[in-house]
A protein has these predicted regions:
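A short acidic Gly-Thr/Ser loop motif
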Residues: 7-12
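Short beta-strand-loop/turn "lid" adjacent to the catalytic site in phosphate-handling enzymes
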Residues: 72-91
């Protein structure tokens, strides 16, 4: 499966959607909020193998946007079977 991760980054949050490229359907969505605060929060929802929606919420300290993005990549890798994540940076 080919997919693309679309990011919208604000001053203390990162929102994202993960799209499957053949049908342009959303296969995962979520956000990291309160970046830089003691209890940053990640909310992630995705379609499982049975095409049913699942959701998790996690909290931990995220000091900056780089660590927030790493958290997003980790949760996508944990919840989406067969997904390989490649980081691309454009400035």
């Amino acid at each position: 499966m080919k997919a693309v991760l679309v990011i919208n980054s604000g001053s203390s949050s990162i929102k994202y959607r993960f799209f499957e490229l053949e049908t342009y359907s959303v296969i995962a969505t979520g956000f990291v909020e309160r970046i830089g605060e003691a209890e940053s929060r990640l909310k992630h929802g995705w379609l499982n193998k049975e095409n049913k929606y699942e959701e998790i919420v996690e909290t931990e300290y995220v000091p900056d946007h780089g660590k927030g993005f790493d958290w997003i990549v980790d949760v996508i890798a944990r919840t989406s079977s067969g997904v390989r994540v490649h980081r691309v940076l454009e400035a």
